[in-house]
């Protein structure tokens, strides 16, 4: 392959990165998929599928595997980063000196920066500088369904209108993958972080056995927390009624493909945090996101009671049922209250 002609380089060969690479390649684009483990990339190349996570989806011929980072980054000006949020900044600093001069960076990572709670746009600007166009994609996307070509829709926000148009054209597929543009760069990022937290809470509720009424109440009040935090950060409230907000929230709170939901269910059934994480076997983004979202909310003065109680369970040893009863026992409020 003449790597100069690749439409996209995907950084991160986990389940979601692989699914996005497959989707792009299925659209007829040459795509390079890079992973940090050469042995893993060699296995993907030999199997021509991601047998660990997406065993029934063969790679299109236009999907190319690469273990050398410099070669992968030379392949395309468009770089899609799909790595866990706690290594996001580290990965950007790693790729910065190897990127092409005309590089543009989009990420599908959902979350905030570990320890600081900063938005990923701030991490990206610090790592990459002010000149590189940035974009984010987010929405209700389980990797298995996306890779299988089942109908999916997401939101896309970018700092550069041309980049947004180009990405929408690259990703959009009328048969299965609908991409909605959205100018709200902050809101599209924030929804993906907060929904991870609320999904843990919904899982806890179901694990305890509280039923559909309680789950729906958590989703609805979780959306209110998301919207309040977004408003404090300057996001457009309508964004949270779209794919990156309500769409992703409903998906991850109601389907057991969600690692965050399954993690919460185990906690609700009495498992401790460590054993629940070990049973999941993959990164549970909501675990770190809970701490980060809580810190961000405190910094901007937004009350998020659901997030607070989930934090108490994850980091302070509080029992999940006790946390739920604390929420139920809060003083009466107007539904439209800012608290």
Curated annotation (Swiss-Prot):
GO biological process, one term: glycerol-3-phosphate catabolic process
Enzyme Commission number(s): 1.1.1.94
EC category name: oxidoreductase
Keywords from the named record: Cytoplasm, Lipid biosynthesis, Lipid metabolism, NAD, NADP, Nucleotide-binding, Oxidoreductase, Phospholipid biosynthesis, Phospholipid metabolism
GO molecular function: glycerol-3-phosphate dehydrogenase [NAD(P)+] activity; NAD binding
Alphabetized HAMAP family for the sequence: NAD_Glyc3P_dehydrog
Gene3D superfamilies recorded: N-(1-d-carboxylethyl)-l-norvaline Dehydrogenase, domain 2 (1.10.1040.10), NAD(P)-binding Rossmann-like Domain (3.40.50.720)
GO cellular component, one term: cytosol
Family per record: Belongs to the NAD-dependent glycerol-3-phosphate dehydrogenase family.
Protein localization: Cytoplasm
Active-site residues, as the UniProt record annotates them: 195 (proton acceptor)
Catalytic activity: sn-glycerol 3-phosphate + NAD(+) = dihydroxyacetone phosphate + NADH + H(+); sn-glycerol 3-phosphate + NADP(+) = dihydroxyacetone phosphate + NADPH + H(+)
Residues reported to bind NADPH: 15-16, 36, 110, 143, 259, 283, 285
Pfam families for this protein: NAD_Gly3P_dh_C, NAD_Gly3P_dh_N
Major localization listed first in the record, in broad terms: cytoplasm
Binding sites annotated in the UniProt record for sn-glycerol 3-phosphate: 110, 139, 141, 195, 248, 258-260
Native source species: Cronobacter sakazakii (strain ATCC BAA-894)
Function, as annotated: Catalyzes the reduction of the glycolytic intermediate dihydroxyacetone phosphate (DHAP) to sn-glycerol 3-phosphate (G3P), the key precursor for phospholipid synthesis.
Protein name: Glycerol-3-phosphate dehydrogenase [NAD(P)+]
Protein's pathway: Membrane lipid metabolism; glycerophospholipid metabolism
């Amino acid at each position: 392959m003449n790597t100069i002609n690749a439409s996209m380089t995907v950084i991160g060969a986990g389940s979601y990165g692989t699914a996005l690479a497959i989707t792009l390649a299925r659209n007829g684009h040459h795509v390079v998929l890079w992973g940090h483990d050469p042995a893993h990339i060699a296995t993907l190349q030999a199997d021509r599928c991601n047998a660990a996570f997406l065993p029934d989806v063969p790679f299109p011929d236009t999907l190319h595997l690469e273990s050398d980072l410099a070669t992968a980054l030379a392949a395309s000006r468009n770089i899609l980063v799909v790595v866990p949020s706690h290594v996001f900044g580290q990965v950007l600093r790693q790729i910065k000196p190897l990127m092409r001069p005309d590089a543009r960076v989009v990420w599908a990572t959902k979350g905030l920066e570990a320890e600081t709670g900063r938005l990923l746009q701030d991490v990206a600007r610090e790592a990459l500088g002010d000149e590189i166009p940035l974009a984010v994609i987010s929405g209700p996307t389980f990797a298995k369904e996306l890779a299988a070509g089942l109908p999916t829709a997401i939101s896309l926000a970018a700092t550069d209108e041309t980049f947004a148009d180009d990405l929408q054209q690259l990703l959009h597929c009328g048969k299965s993958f609908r991409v909605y543009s959205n100018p709200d760069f902050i809101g599209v990022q924030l929804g993906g972080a907060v929904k991870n937290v609320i999904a843990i809470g919904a899982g806890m509720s179901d694990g305890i056995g509280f039923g559909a009424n309680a789950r729906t109440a958590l989703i609805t009040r979780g959306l209110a927390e998301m919207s309040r935090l977004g408003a404090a950060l300057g996001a457009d409230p309508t964004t949270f009624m779209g794919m990156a907000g309500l769409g992703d929230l409903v998906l991850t709170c109601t389907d057991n493909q969600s690692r965050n939901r399954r993690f919460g269910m185990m906690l609700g059934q009495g498992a401790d945090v460590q054993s629940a994480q070990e049973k999941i076997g993959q990164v549970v983004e909501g675990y770190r996101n809970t701490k980060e979202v809580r810190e961000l909310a405190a910094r901007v003065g937004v009350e998020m009671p659901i997030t607070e109680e989930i934090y108490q369970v994850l980091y302070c040893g509080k029992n999940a049922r006790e946390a739920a009863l604390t929420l139920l026992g809060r003083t009466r409020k107007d539904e439209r209250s800012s608290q």
